[in-house]
Amino acid sequence: MIIITGHGNFASGLKSSLDLIVGNYDFIKVVDFTENKNPEELKNDIKSIIDKYSDNELYIFTDLAGGTPFKVSSELALNNNVKVFCGTNLPMLIEASMMVSLGCDIDTNFIKETGINAINPKKKVVEFKEEGI
């Protein structure tokens, strides 16, 4: 089971992109931390998913280390079978969702490396020339 959470519509935005690339999986849940939600509501929303799927390995992917979604998720992970990632990007979620879809546990080190490798700057830069008006 994968839970994606973050500030604003970070989670639902990533899920939308993920669905286009790998398909819509039932084992991926999203919890957005929007401006009309307080930290306790966020915690309750995430906890309800954890409680419902407590028999499964659970992985929570968050946006920022130290942010409210990360802190709430980390707190909930202490008493549950949950692993928490921060700094989530789309390549991490693609790999994680493929692992779960194949019935594998998520290789946390591989997911971390995938996230890091996805942000490497490219050596070749494409230059655009402005056409005259």
Give the label of every model feature segment:
Residues 1-61, 65-133:
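N-terminal loops that bind phosphate or other acidic moieties
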